[in-house]
Amino acid sequence: MLDDFKIDLLVKNKPPTSTTAVVAMSGGVDSSVAAALLHKLGYKVIGITLQLYNNNNNSNTKGACCGSLDTQDAKQVASSMGFPHYTLNYEKVFREEVIEDFIDTYTQGKTPIPCIKCNQVIKFRDLLNATKSLGADVLVTGHYIRKIEQDDDIYVYSSKDTKKDQSYFLFATTVEQLRLLRFPLGNFHKEDIRKLAKYFNLQVANKPDSQNICFVTDTYKKTIAELRPHTIKKGNIIDINGNILSQHNGIVNFTIGQRKGIGISSKAPLYVIKLNPDTNEVTVGPKSALLQNKLYIREINWLAKEKIPHNGLNVKVKLRSSHSGSPATIFPNNNNTATILLQDSYCTVTPGQACVIYDHDRMLGGGWIC
């Protein structure tokens, strides 16, 4: 069966038996298979799991990742396959750099993506440091994404399994980080990975995919209320003309484009159009008021060697992880920002989300929507 899972050498011109690979193990099936496959192919595998929170007493965190229960799963996989595994406790750093940022973003009237922030400031930054300190050659993850190196240039592509592609969540990964990163699952489909997990007799073979924000045990609103209750303040719900329609119990309860749960009866459907943290107001209106064909992005991470020309570059952009992509033109601005002109108007351009930029299936980079 292993003949169906051929991968390129992790390090060019270096045999597996001479290559040490740190594998970031979340406790899920993908990273477990990545580690097991490399071990079977003869690589010197070291499994590392970052424990980001404790879910021992909370069954609601099933479907998440990187908790104490997931650490146990990763450790069991390593033990059954016969390679070393280490757990690094990152609960404090995770709280300070991801959870606090998550709450800050919501209280600013934006909608965060903590998974990208976690990859950016913890998983890749700190795991890469651990990889270097161990003297390992590469850091391997179970992400569904493809990377090709040619003549010292790096090209990143969507996964062959388009339903599982995770390139959107990795837009903030830098070129220097990518030089040490390897993604052996990018050329395979999820169903094949589960078959391989069963072939290796991994206990996580049927473990559900992570779908939730790992540290949110119920709803994100409840999490914010528990961790920072003083930020939840009542305010007005207004229409697009400024007329007061009702009151709300905190802008963190809303996101741009939301229709359900607004709490206002109306003949025509109402959507959340704007969140104003300064006035603590929620603006609602018809769906047509959500349509936009221009947006701005900041903190751009540009992976392509070619710079964005001043007269613009025609691209495809994804404004949500589930978005199939829209044709657009990107124009560079000062201070690592850019303007995006969409070919067609798009609903729910949401501040705080990521705008990831592609040339067909090649990821060029991305930035945060202002």
Curated annotation (Swiss-Prot):
Top-rank EC class of the record's enzyme: transferase
Site annotation Interaction with tRNA: residues: H143, Q353
Chain's role: Catalyzes the 2-thiolation of uridine at the wobble position (U34) of tRNA, leading to the formation of s(2)U34.
EC number(s) stated in the UniProt entry for this protein: 2.8.1.13
CDD domains documented for this protein: MnmA_TRMU-like
PANTHER family for this protein: MITOCHONDRIAL TRNA-SPECIFIC 2-THIOURIDYLASE 1 (PTHR11933:SF5), TRNA 5-METHYLAMINOMETHYL-2-THIOURIDYLATE -METHYLTRANSFERASE (PTHR11933)
Family assignment from sequence similarity: Belongs to the MnmA/TRMU family.
Disulphide connectivity of cysteines: C118-C214
Region spans: Interaction with tRNA: 164-166
A Pfam family assignment: tRNA_Me_trans
Main localization of the protein described in the UniProt heading: cytoplasm
Sorted UniProt keywords: ATP-binding, Cytoplasm, Disulfide bond, Nucleotide-binding, RNA-binding, Transferase, tRNA processing, tRNA-binding
GO biological process: tRNA wobble position uridine thiolation
Protein name from the UniProt record: tRNA-specific 2-thiouridylase MnmA
Cellular compartments per GO CC: cytoplasm
UniProt catalytic activity: S-sulfanyl-L-cysteinyl-[protein] + uridine(34) in tRNA + AH2 + ATP = 2-thiouridine(34) in tRNA + L-cysteinyl-[protein] + A + AMP + diphosphate + H(+)
Subcellular compartments: Cytoplasm
Gene field: mnmA
Active site: C118 (nucleophile), C214 (cysteine persulfide intermediate)
Binding site for ATP: A24, M25, S26, G27, G28, V29, D30, S31, L50, G142
Gene Ontology MF, one: ATP binding
